[in-house]
Amino acid sequence: MAADRAQNLQDTFLNHVRKTKTPLTIFLVNGVKLQGIVTWFDNFCLLLRRDGHSQLVYKHAISTIMPGAPIQLFEGGEDAPA
């Protein structure tokens, strides 16, 4: 069934930036700025890689994620699926 395979926006976004190796700037709730590419993620954390080093970042500590380049998650000109 199609609903079984549907992903939420967060997973769609993270999977896209992981596959395309899009550089990200991540701001944590305490104001710390992290930069790198996502190499792995699950429901609770993500692995951020930069300069050969990896950081495990818990999602509950993330405030904002900004991609280094524009991304298009969905086909067509709409921002979100209908």
UniProtKB/Swiss-Prot annotation:
InterPro entries: Hfq, LSM_dom_sf, Sm. HAMAP family: Hfq. GO terms for biological process: regulation of DNA-templated transcription; regulation of RNA stability; regulation of translation, ncRNA-mediated. Keywords: RNA-binding, Stress response. The keyword RNA-binding applies. RNA chaperone that binds small regulatory RNA (sRNAs) and mRNAs to facilitate mRNA translational regulation in response to envelope stress, environmental stress and changes in metabolite concentrations. Also binds with high specificity to tRNAs. Residues 11-71 form the Sm domain. Homohexamer. Belongs to the Hfq family. This is RNA-binding protein Hfq. It comes from the Bacteria. GO terms for molecular function: RNA binding. GO terms for cellular component: cytosol. PANTHER family: RNA-BINDING PROTEIN HFQ (PTHR34772:SF1).
